[in-house]
Amino acid sequence: MTVRNLFLLPGDGIGPEAMAEVRKIIAYMNAERDAGFVTDEGLVGGSAYDAHGAAISEGDMAKALAADAVLFGAVGGPKWDAVPYEVRPEAGLLRLRKDLELFANLRPAICYPALANASSLKPELVEGLDILIVRELTGGVYFGEPKEIVDLGNGQKRGIDTQVYDTYEIERIAGVAFELARTRNNRVCSMEKRNVMKSGVLWNQVVTETHKAKYSDVQLEHMLADAGGMQLVRQPKQFDVIVTDNLFGDMLSDVAAMLTGSLGMLPSASLGAPDAKTGKRKALYEPVHGSAPDIAGTGVANPIAMIASFAMCLRYSFNLVKEADDLEKAIANVLDQGIRTGDIMAEGCRKVGTAEMGDAILAEFKSLSA
C-alpha cells in the first residue's frame, strides 16, 4: 500500500473546526479505500506563539519539510495583535512558503451553479465558471531590492520598490501553467504589462519561448494585465488558466474570486519545484478565507474551502484524480440540495453548522465513490 504523508496545521480561529471535517474524509478514505494517509499535526500562527513563542516551531517546520504535503487552516486574531512583528501569526505561513520554496500559487475561481445568484455579475456570466490563476509567488516587486524609503533631505521622501524577474523564475511558473492547462481545457493566457515595464517584456518573451520549446500543443494567448482585469469582469468564462507575476496575480486572483460570489469558499495551493529524484513537488494547501475569530468555536463556520483545499491536495500532490473529482462533485451536489452554512444562506435553503455540512459532503462523497 502506498504511504501518503500529510502534515496538518489547523492554526487559529475556525481553522481547527474546518480541519476536523477533513479528518473525517481522511478517516473514511483510509478505512474504506486503503488510501494510506499517515497524518501528523502541529501548531502554527497564534497557537504556536502561545506554546513556543514562535509562529511555527523548528520541530513542526521539520515535519512540514518531511511531509508529502501540508494542509493549512488559518492564522491570526486580535489576541495576537500586539506580539512582535517577527513572530506574528502570519509569519508562520511566510516561513512555510520560504522554507518549502513554494513559488507557484494556484487560485481557482469556481462558481458553483447553485450559488450563481450570489455573484455581483449576472448569473449567466458566471454560472459554471472555472478559472485557475497561476501566480508567481516568490519574485517580483514584493521581493526585489532595493526596497526602501529614502529621505531626500528637502522635506521630501522617496519610496522605492523594485520589480525584478530572472529568466528561470518565469520559465518555471510558465511550465506549471502549461502543465496544468493540459489537465484542463488546454488554454493559457499570460498577463503582464510589456507596454510600460521591462520585466513585462522579458515575461512575454520567456513565456513565448517556453511555450514554443515544450508546450506548443497548448493554446497560448498574451494579454496586458489591466485589459485582463477588464475581461475578467466582462467575459470571465473565456479564460481557462491565467499565468501572471506576483503583483498582478495578487490582484487578479482576488478579482476572479469575487466573481464567484463566495470568496470564503475557495481553496488554494502553493507548489514548489519537482524533486530531482522523485519528481514530487513540495506543496501547501489552504483555504482563501481567514481565521474568522468572531465565530471560532461556535460550530457555524463553513468548512467547504478547507475540504476543497484537500481536494486540490488529492489532485496535485497524490494524483488521486478520481477522488478529487468526486470530492468536488460532492460539494456541488450538497449545494444543489440547498444545504447551506450561515454565510451562504439563501431563501428556501436549509441552514446547517460546520459538522453537519461536513457530514453531508462526506455522505455524498461516499455515494459517488461506491
Curated annotation (Swiss-Prot):
Pfam families linked: Iso_dh
EC identifiers of the protein: 1.1.1.85
Keywords of the record: Amino-acid biosynthesis, Branched-chain amino acid biosynthesis, Cytoplasm, Leucine biosynthesis, Magnesium, Manganese, Metal-binding, NAD, Oxidoreductase
A GO cellular-component term linked to this record: cytosol
Cofactor: how bound: Binds 1 Mg(2+) or Mn(2+) ion per subunit.
Residues engaged in binding substrate: R97, R107, R135, D226
Keyword set includes Ribonucleoprotein: no
Site (Important for catalysis): Y142, K193
Cofactor: Mg(2+); Mn(2+)
Biological role stated in the UniProt entry: Catalyzes the oxidation of 3-carboxy-2-hydroxy-4-methylpentanoate (3-isopropylmalate) to 3-carboxy-4-methyl-2-oxopentanoate. The product decarboxylates to 4-methyl-2 oxopentanoate.
Quaternary organization: Homodimer.
Protein name: 3-isopropylmalate dehydrogenase
Species: Rhizobium meliloti (strain 1021) (Ensifer meliloti)
